[in-house]
Amino acid sequence: LRNDLSKSCAPHSVRVTKLCGLERYAYVQHLVSVITGRLATGKSALDVLESAFPGGSITGAPKVRAMQIIAELEQTARGAYCGSLAYVGFDGACDSSILIRTITAAGGHWQFPVGGGIVADSVPAAELEETWHKAEGMLRAM
């Protein structure tokens, strides 16, 4: 994300103010980083969203090649899952969220996709267990 923000921010203004802070929730834990920057002249919050989308925590890295691999391997569209919900205020303020843990309904069917990132040292059984942990909170909510 730091690299993505550099495309829309003033030179040398992008800062990582929090790196991989652990946030605990009922069924999952997330590593959360905070990255800030000052908009470059002529850039807007929409430029930031465009350069940052899709989120690297969803695609993997390097982002462009990871997206090519996802397109080659995934046989169905993700729909809202792993997309983004955002707002941009009239004052230029912006906030966004990647749609994971999201239930959608269409045609009388409800769904909530879950998954995990696969990396070189992934353990398949542990990835499956993590996926079930992610699903558990959604299942209980339904």
Question: What are the residue ranges of the model-derived segments?
Answer:
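Short acidic, Gly/Ser-rich segments with clustered Asp/Glu that frequently serve as metal-coordination loops
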Residues: 1-8, 21-25
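Conserved hydrophobic core element of enzyme catalytic domains
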Residues: 25-142
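Short secondary-structure junctions
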Residues: 11-16, 40
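Short acidic, glycine/serine/threonine-rich loops at helix termini
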Residues: 7-10, 123-125
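Gly/Ser/Thr-rich active-site loops/lids in small-molecule metabolic enzymes
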Residues: 14-30
